[in-house]
């Protein structure tokens, strides 16, 4: 069995008492792995009919499945690159369902990287409402951006700031907030030996201090009647019950709806803590909608691209940042005082006398919204050639073409003289 920190074992024994030995025995078992379906791109029925992997339903989420990584590698399947599913630890999938997201909700993911909760929220919103996906760590935010881009949504703003600045911008604004708080990571011990090496009790207390600050700021951003879900992937009482109980005691309008621990000896998962809080007190909201400059001549090259290569006309909610053109969410809040990575959907880059579509746009559009689609079957080696950055011989000269796998757009190519030049981003190209 793996060697676990002595102080950690002492504390868990106090919490679990008679179940302690059963908990320890769970470390002799393999880690659990899961994937979660993006229902904006493929229905559960169609996904299951493909019969790609030996999947088992995860009981606490309709879109989640267990898989055995010794038998299959979903991360090396083109459907993963297409954003059809997201690889996520199974017990972590228990968090977002507690939010009870409704279409049109305004939602905040305060500690979002690498994107597990945010991608789940986007699929629940189904291209309605708004998600503000925040990550304070500037290194981790790049992975967040890539994962959200792959899921294909226009209603998401990605910010890179701390909870205090968020609170000052969004007081009383959100219907739902999730805080997957930075923690000591005790629930990662079985799958990541580095987490064991990094663990100290002082880290537990350091995380607790940060968690208390984040939940206070998060609560201020909820509107009356709103729901806040707090979660960690750790087992310490200090970072879980103690944080929640102190917060509830300090806030008369905060009501604890439920709290739950998922232990690895009780469920098939690595472990999680989840608490659901409702806000009953009023909060004065002064968030203003972003004022957009009407763009006409500035986007003529985009409109020309749209006319030639798309079957839709996107509404005129455009924003220019340098040469980058964005389609911003409806009723987009003013976020000018925050560091913003993405203002909604990045459409592409306006260059001299032409428009170059973004990778994000290919993931957002449905195949019927694109004039020219080169569909490739999942079992055709050509799709791997495309993902590696190779050209594809098509025999046509249609200009901008969306490459799709099983009817799901996965990226762009530009076709001339019978050859499709590859525009799949170099940083995303596969090595296998």
Residue ranges and their predicted role:
Residues 139, 176-217, 229, 233-240:
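Mobile active-site "lid"/loop adjacent to the S-adenosyl-L-methionine
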Residues 114-127:
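Conserved SAM-binding loop of SAM-dependent methyltransferases across substrates and taxa
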């Amino acid at each position: 069995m793996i060697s676990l920190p002595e102080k950690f074992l002492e504390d868990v024994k106090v919490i679990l008492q008679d179940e302690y030995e059963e908990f320890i025995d769970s470390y002799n078992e393999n880690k659990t792995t899961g994937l979660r379906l993006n229902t904006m791109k493929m229905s559960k029925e169609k996904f299951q009919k493909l019969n790609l992997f030996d999947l088992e339903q995860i009981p606490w989420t309709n879109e989640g499945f267990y898989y055995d990584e010794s038998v299959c590698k979903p991360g090396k399947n083109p459907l993963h690159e297409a954003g059809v599913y997201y690889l996520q630890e199974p017990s972590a999938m228990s968090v977002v369902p507690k939010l009870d997201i409704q279409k049109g909700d305004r939602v905040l993911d305060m500690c979002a990287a690498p994107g597990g909760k945010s991608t789940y929220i986007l699929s629940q919103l189904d291209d309605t409402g708004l998600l503000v996906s925040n990550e304070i760590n500037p290194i981790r935010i790049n992975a967040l951006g890539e994962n959200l881009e792959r899921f294909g949504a226009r209603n998401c703003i990605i910010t890179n700031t701390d909870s205090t600045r968020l609170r000052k911008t969004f007081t009383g604004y959100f219907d739902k907030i999730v805080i997957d708080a930075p923690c000591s990571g005790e629930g990662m011990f079985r799958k990541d030996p580095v987490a064991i090496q990094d663990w100290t009790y002082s880290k537990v207390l350091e995380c607790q201090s940060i968690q208390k600050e984040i939940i206070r700021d998060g609560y201020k951003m909820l509107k009356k009647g709103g729901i806040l879900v707090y979660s960690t992937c750790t087992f310490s009482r200090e970072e879980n019950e103690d944080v929640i109980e102190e917060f509830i005691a300090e806030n008369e309008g905060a009501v604890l709806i439920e709290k739950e621990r998922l232990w690895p000896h009780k469920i098939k998962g690595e472990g999680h803590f989840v608490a659901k809080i409702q806000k009953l007190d009023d909060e004065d909201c002064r968030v203003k909608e972003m004022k957009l400059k009407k763009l006409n001549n500035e986007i003529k090259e985009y409109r020309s691209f749209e006319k030639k290569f798309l079957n839709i006309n996107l509404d005129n909610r455009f924003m220019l940042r340098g040469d980058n053109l964005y389609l911003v969410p409806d009723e987009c809040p003013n976020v000018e005082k925050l560091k913003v990575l993405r203002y909604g959907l990045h459409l592409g880059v306006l260059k001299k006398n032409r428009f170059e579509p973004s990778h994000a746009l290919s993931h957002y559009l449905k195949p019927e919204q694109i004039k020219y689609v080169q569909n490739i079957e999942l079992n055709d080696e050509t799709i791997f050639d495309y993902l590696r950055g190779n050209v594809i011989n098509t025999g046509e000269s249609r200009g901008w073409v969306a490459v799709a796998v099983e009817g799901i757009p996965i990226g762009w190519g530009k076709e001339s003289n019978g050859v499709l030049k590859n525009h799949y981003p170099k940083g995303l190209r596969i090595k296998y």
